[in-house]
Amino acid sequence: MKKLLLYLFLITAGLISTVQVSAQKEIAPGVIKLQKGEIDTFTPYSLFGGKPVIEAMKALPAAKLPFDAKDVQIKITDRGCLIEVPLEDNEQIYGFGLQFETFGQRGLRKRPIVNDNPLNGLGYTHAPQTFYVSTKGYGILVNTARYTTFLCGSNQKTEHSRQQRIEERKHIATTTEDLYKNRSNGNKIFIDVPGAKGIEVFVITGP
């Protein structure tokens, strides 16, 4: 019995450790760094990042996140890292670098990858960035050089009714954008970073 209880305790502790962010630090006014696991040696910030201009940033008006930074979850598995960021119903998402086919990214799947001849709206572009901004006044930067996929609120809420799903499926997709767009409002952005043993996420607030 004692062995069983010990086993259950270890399993539970392991599951919790895959979700909780191991480090949270404000590295500049309005910039919070979330970190978990073993960070890659080469990342955009480690290679090109300069020092924040602290005094100039202090002069900017303070902004409040629409969620607690602790609500951002980072899970590390054998496959890589999965990041979950809360998303409100009336929130729109923009970014991921120079995008040709789409502007508002809510409800879409984006994979920012360098491509000199992008033929679709999935994220391939001349100047991709693992960064997006929200109409709620904040930005999310995933500090990684790995191929990263963003599911921008395309998940189904658990309370989403069966009838609503049936109605939405009546719409026939005729473009790539429509194919990956979800008519319902998901409540999270899922960020998938395969192969990563750890990750840094910068949460940036602004006026």
Predicted regions and their residues:
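Bacterial Sec-dependent N-terminal signal peptides
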Residues: M1-E26
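Catalytic and substrate-binding clefts that recognize carbohydrates or anionic sugar/phosphate headgroups
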Residues: Q24-P207
